[in-house]
Amino acid sequence: MSKLTALIQELVEPLLTPMGYELVDLQYGREGGRYILRLFIDRPEGIGLDDCEQVSRVVSALLDEKDPIPHSYYLEVSSPGLERPLKKEADFNRFAGRKVKLRTFAPINGQRHFQGRLLGYQDGQVRMHLEEGWDLAIPLEQVATARLVFDLADDEED
């Protein structure tokens, strides 16, 4: 995470939490000649268009006041979607039992890509039951990316 995105996160999270929203992810970069700041928000009952509009208004006002971004940009606010990223320790426990894809920074047992059922987070490690039939514990600092995999069977259980 860059210094700028870390600063934006520090400004935005305390604003969203009392409103009942979780900042799932934040992306900032240049695309097609313009800068875009994307916020992905969630809450237990899900996200609708009204939520995105409300968060966009309050975040836009805050960023206009604090002015941490040195040039013009577009602000986009959306749901993380069905295959949301897992970033925080709490995410790995909240979605235990769900199907996930995980990529590590360095190979573990000769591979960097894993898919299976998330068992949770414990003692600094993400635990999962792999599709190959064995369990794996990966230190959180070795996880490059992790995200839910949409599985209709999981959705029907909820």
Swiss-Prot record:
Keywords: Cytoplasm, Ribosome biogenesis. The keyword Cytoplasm applies. Pfam families: DUF150_C (PF17384), RimP_N (PF02576). One of its GO terms (cellular component) is cytosol. InterPro entries: Ribosome_maturation_RimP, RimP_C, RimP_C_sf, RimP_N, RimP_N_sf. GO terms for biological process: ribosomal small subunit assembly; translation. It is found in: Cytoplasm. SUPFAM superfamilies: YhbC-like, C-terminal domain, YhbC-like, N-terminal domain. The keyword Ligase does not apply. Belongs to the RimP family. Required for maturation of 30S ribosomal subunits. This is Ribosome maturation factor RimP. It comes from Moorella thermoacetica (strain ATCC 39073 / JCM 9320). The lineage of its organism: Bacteria, Bacillati, Bacillota, Clostridia, Moorellales.
